[in-house]
Amino acid sequence: MGKLLFGKLVFKKSLFLLSGMSSLAVFLTACGATKIFDSSVQLLVSDNFSTLADKSFSQMSYEGIRSFFKKSKGVDLPEADSSQLQEGNGLWKRPGFTLSDRIATFNNIKNDGSDVIVATGFNQQESLQAITSDDIRFQSDKESLAKTGFIFVDGAIEKEFNKRNGVPQFKSTPTNISSVAFRSDDGSFLTGVATAVYLNLNQEYFLDKSGWSTNSSNNNELTVSGFVGIALPSTLSFLNGFRLGIAYFNEVIYKHLSDAQDSSAQVTTSKQTVLKQLQVANGEKRIKKIKWISPKQGSDGETINIQDHQSGSFSDTEPRAITIANNLIDKGVNAIIPIAGPQTNLVVTQIARRQAHTAVIGVDSAQELLDINIDAPNKDKLKMGNKKIIPFSSIKALDVAVESILSTLEKGSSQNGYQGFGYNNIGTVKNNSVGVSEAGYEFLIDPVFWKNTSSMQAMSLSASLKANAASSSDNKKKLSEVATKKNENGSTKNGSNDIIDKYAKLLTKSSSSTSMRNGSSDSNQQNFKTTDNDGDWTIVGDELGKYKSSELPIFTGSSSYPTFQTEAQNVLDGGANVASTQGFKWSFKQI
């Protein structure tokens, strides 16, 4: 996972390495396999340990290139796992280890005849900042690469890079770079909702005590938890959005799905929630709110500490990740979201070893498709889903972002909300660049299914909710009638008023929105809004440490909350002219 979020550096920079000789290094850098492809666009993977067919970061970015050529030129590029695709044969390269290595690789790709380099991962930033800087040591590289375009994936270029004591390492003018970072919190909001639905639809399985400690006190509850490798803005963003998705399910959707646990003395018949929604086959267990559980033994009170929710590294052998997984299994947690890179595999392994009825929610890419995903223990008891330990994931759709930026550069105008050179773009729910993986579509329910939303295109979501509040009790539906992303209109295609669009509106602040929290009228209140007015669910970034309910305690112990931009931002000073794409060939062929 990238450690750079929306232009805010959250990782320790590597030591600065002089690379004035990088032009010479072009001739000294190993070129890998013999070139057999001539492509206008090449992929540069994150580091020298990365590969192309990783079913993750590299492959998703490459799929964006493939999709662009297919849609724009009708040309089929080889699939990522094709034996034809060797490193260095014209479609992808590894970057090397040092700053000078990376810049040399840029020049190698340019010398291959490629016009655009898709550079993936936060660790590409230093070299990109260098070749667009005013630093005299990199002027030859800046001139050499001035007519080469770059797409920086999962990061953002800064005008002043790596400031220390007020002095930047580089002052950059990225006239030939278009970058994209991702609102992963918005995407994981959708995943939180889908997780709550998934657990409820499979109550019989998840309320089974298999694999739990006999000391578990959560025997009749549906519970979730998660942890990060290190508490950084980029990782806490995932955790925050996921928790808010659970909160929206608990505080808003819940009211319209079941009346089993409502107080009938305080709720009139006309206000009672929809008949028997999300109940298991025996008709007895109604929908449940989802409770958050701390990995620390004995700490499930009103306040929990973020330090208990971090393993301390992103290592694939981190022992604390194993400890956290086992503590959560002991507590009977039904779903865990590990935001710690390869430590997802460690959690899956512990669940399989203990035959626990616990799901793992994937992160970044569709991890349910990876080889690490195996059959869930007693899988036949799961009524819905893929019957694997990882049912679905919270994703960054790198393929969508890469294809959109390539299309923008080719056409010379914004495509899918993405801008070209000189812009830091943002992947959002609105432009289909973050969200839940396709395997989770059957659990991503319409967030306002009880409302008449036919007029949502003409008004904000919150205004539509207000306008339809009086008739909401008349729109009762059985579960089979509640639209999901999978079954809406018999299609998964996104449209102007589809379920994804409704979530995008829900997560976008408007002038007519009311505050999500009671705290807007009483600063001492810190509860999620639970009144009939469903409120403003725009994610600010610090909700982990501010807002709570009886099921979702406040997190303490961190100030590393992210700040967000919500749309593409021009990072060029006035008067700077972006690089021209008129000479780009936009072609691909096998030699």
Curated annotation (Swiss-Prot):
Q: Quick one: where's the S-diacylglycerol cysteine lipidation?
A: 31
Assigned protein family: To T.pallidum TmpC.
Identify the keywords attached in UniProt to this record, alphabetized.
Cell membrane, Lipoprotein, Membrane, Palmitate, Signal
> Which residues bear N-palmitoyl cysteine-type lipidation?
31
Q: Which domain of life is it from?
A: Bacteria
Biased region (Low complexity) positions are 510-523
- The annotated region (Disordered) lies at 476-497, 510-535
**How does the entry describe its membrane topology?**
Lipid-anchor
Q: What's the protein called, per UniProt?
A: Uncharacterized lipoprotein MG040
| One Gene Ontology cellular component | plasma membrane
Q: Which residues form the signal peptide?
A: 1-30
Q: Name one Pfam family in it.
A: Bmp
Residue spans of biased composition, Basic and acidic residues class:
476-488
Q: Which InterPro entries match?
A: BMP_lipoprotein (IPR050957), PnrA-like (IPR003760)
Location in the cell reads: Cell membrane
